[in-house]
Amino acid sequence: MKPIAITVWLASAFAAFAAPVAANEFDHVWSCELKPGKTLDDARAVARSWLAAARSMKNGERLEVSIRYPIIVSESENRFDFVVRAPSLAVWGAFYDTYDDGTPVADADLKFADVAGCSGSTMWESIGVQ
């Protein structure tokens, strides 16, 4: 009986501590610059197309996209961040594993490249605070 009680207690403790970690959202953020003659409206339009393409693919249904841009600028007014949010790192990884040439999102990438050049990216984990 004692080994069963210990096992149940450990499983409960693990679940209590693991659940919040598993629920953390992840953002993949690309630093981008508009190409000459392009606007943030153009960037939003291709971002919408990218999101539609991503959501049409396996594991992309729950992705979200946003464009972040500075409102006070000391450098380039054409800089913005392209942000893809996934409900978990596992969801992002499963989607990214299907990201290949010939997929809808790869075609959307080519259209995005006509509007902006993106150099480098970072992954961010969001941890809610209560």
Each language-model region and where it sits:
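Short, surface-exposed ligand-recognition loops at beta-strand->loop->(often short) alpha-helix junctions
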Residues: 35-46
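An amphipathic, aromatic/His-enriched active-site/gating alpha helix that lines ligand/cofactor pockets
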Residues: 48-64, 75-76, 83-122
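Bacterial N-terminal signal peptides
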Residues: 5-16
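N-terminal secretory/targeting leader peptides
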Residues: 68-73, 124-129
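Sec/Tat signal peptide C-region and signal peptidase I cleavage site
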Residues: 17-23
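Short, surface-exposed coil-to-beta transition loops
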Residues: 27, 77-80
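N-terminal secretory signal peptides that target proteins for export/translocation
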Residues: 1-2
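Acidic/histidine-rich, surface-exposed loop or edge segments in extracytoplasmic proteins
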Residues: 24-35
